[in-house]
Amino acid sequence: MVNMKASMFLTFAGLVLLFVVCYASESEEKEFPKEMLSSIFAVDNDFKQEERDCAGYMRECKEKLRCSGYVCSSRWKWCVLPAPWRR
């Protein structure tokens, strides 16, 4: 069972690597690998937690209504409880 999981993981990783190498070889840009890695690991401003106004737990974030103890989820635009992984 473990060997099958490991072989499937290695097969999948090999296919992903093959895709990346083929795509990079077709690209005419010399800086492609660097650009690709920077785009994969770049943090977009949309994913950063923002302090916004909110109306209450699991409610849509509003600009005019404020509530303490909640933060606005950047993904769903709902008011949620603050947690360490959301900071």
Curated annotation (Swiss-Prot):
UniProtKB keywords: Disulfide bond, Ion channel impairing toxin, Knottin, Secreted, Signal, Toxin
Cellular localisation: Secreted
Q: Name one GO molecular function term.
A: toxin activity
Q: Which Pfam families match?
A: Toxin_12 (PF07740)
Name the residues of the propeptide.
25-52
What does UniProt give as GO cellular component? extracellular region
- InterPro entries for this protein: Huwentoxin-1 (IPR011696)
- What are the boundaries of the signal sequence? 1-24
Q: What does the record say about tissue specificity?
A: Expressed by the venom gland.
Q: What family is this protein classified in?
A: Belongs to the neurotoxin 10 (Hwtx-1) family. 51 (Hntx-8) subfamily. Hntx-8 sub-subfamily.
Q: Main role?
A: Ion channel inhibitor.
Q: What is this protein called?
A: U3-theraphotoxin-Hhn1o
**Organism annotation:** Cyriopagopus hainanus
